[in-house]
Amino acid sequence: MSKRWALPLLLGIFLLAYLLPLGSHGLWIPDETRYAQISQEMLLSGNWVSPHFMNLRYFEKPAAGYWMIAIGQAVFGQNLFGVRFASALSTGLSVLLCFLIARRLWNEPRKSFVCALLYMSFVIVAGQAGYANLDPQFTFWVNLSLVALWFALDSRANGQRLAGWAVLGLACGMGFMTKGFLAWLLPVLIALPWMLWQKRWKELLLYGPVAIAVAIIVSLPWALAVHGQEPDYWRFFFWHEHIRRFAGDDAQHDAPWWFYLPLLVAFSLPWVGMLPVAFKQAWQTRRETGIAFLGLWLLMPLLFFSLSNGKLPTYILPCLLPLALLLGHALADRLRLEQGRALGLNGLLNLLLGLVTLIGLVYVQLKRPLYDHELHSLVLVFIALTGWIISNLLQAFRPLQCWAAPAVGSLLLIALLPAALPRSVVANKMPDQFVLAHQKELTATTHLLSNDLGAASALSWRVKRPQVALYNTIGELKYGLAYPDGIQQRVDPDQVQQWMREARKTGSVGVVMRVKGQDELDELDRLPKDGVRYEQGNLVIMILPQEAS
């Protein structure tokens, strides 16, 4: 692989595998509809300081991540592509960082390309590139901070060191405004032990304040602005989103300490078979400064999140770039030495996984069909699985010539699978598609009501109206609903009939209900029976006309 073609080829893969599929499927609940609506509300209201979710205060995250999604909607339109563009761009920039740091570490064009290709073909990374949430953005800022740190440490000229530390501060500041204080902590977890081990603590004391100053300069204007607009923001954000989430006895998403170990293996698909070789080589060369840095980058965040009480799978996304570098380093060396055994085993492992999945799908489809007269979706699934199987068959039997084949299978799978989901999944997990089918009628109504936050946010985003009355549902909007100007948006079951009478005096009402059991059936039964009604999966849309006065 020549220097000339590496980046254009990666760009082409980015366009085909990351950007092209962005508009092929609806918004997943709860994350995608939430982030789409919050960022859209910034555009509609002009309030870019304090995040609001369906017109209610929502202080679980800072503002910068919403800014990026809002900019995507402003540039490309308030559509699926616009909502997801920030995630795709952030992931693409992380791929570029992987290429650049690999080139700095080893100065081998093919190795740089291999590392970047492995990173962008990780199933979880490619999946996140087409998923509208804050994790791809936060991962990019963490990646940028640590790549900048390595460039600073590896530079001999004072000007280059200063620039590296300044970029580190910029990344920490933006990461902080995207997801919070972890953006400051994670680089420290790597930089401090590495600098002490290398006996370069004087350099840390000299240049560290530069990074701190830049981070403060970047984040302080917004931090002061949000405090001036919402004095309770920092109390809620610090204690609820940091202390309770990671250290509290009632921490969210509690899981055992080993939770991330199998996840790290799964996240390395389709390159799991290369892990033993990569880890063995990393251990043998652990005294090399670059390998030691990558080892700290991989292990320290993994250790921190493993010891915290609250755990979510996406917390360890910042660990994947150093993992890709270690894997790519080992894979490129195997190619140079013409040692294809590990690559062949990797292809064989993926081949077996694909065959088992295909056989399982055929069995389920014959016994209890997932797809009900959905030939188009079923064909897409079989194309995706067949692509995975063929690509890994090639690597299994021609490992040195077809070493990159699993990347093709992985990217094809992630590109096609969301568009190939059964109608039952789309109806229940992507309510914006049902709303889209009746968007004209819902947009024409005066008032909106929903008993489900995911459906409500999908409705709000599709009709471009933040004000949705929440019928017997609170969830993550508990904080916002507690404010005097928010409580009026809440409608309890014993109030809904009175609310409906008052609303229909001034205009028509659009209702989106999720009906999963008897409780929701009772909620539905309290609503008027006239008007137009549509059903799909467990969703019900009602258009209730204005009552004559």
UniProtKB/Swiss-Prot annotation:
The chain crosses the membrane at residues 9-29, 80-102, 112-132, 133-153, 176-196, 204-224, 259-279, 290-310, 312-332, 342-362, 377-397, 402-422. It is a multi-pass membrane protein. It catalyses: 4-amino-4-deoxy-alpha-L-arabinopyranosyl di-trans,octa-cis-undecaprenyl phosphate + lipid IVA = lipid IIA + di-trans,octa-cis-undecaprenyl phosphate. One of its GO terms (molecular function) is mannosyltransferase activity. Catalyzes the transfer of the L-Ara4N moiety of the glycolipid undecaprenyl phosphate-alpha-L-Ara4N to lipid A. The modified arabinose is attached to lipid A and is required for resistance to polymyxin and cationic antimicrobial peptides. Belongs to the glycosyltransferase 83 family. This is Undecaprenyl phosphate-alpha-4-amino-4-deoxy-L-arabinose arabinosyl transferase 2. It comes from Pseudomonas fluorescens (strain Pf0-1). The lineage of its organism: Bacteria, Pseudomonadati, Pseudomonadota, Gammaproteobacteria, Pseudomonadales. The gene is arnT2.
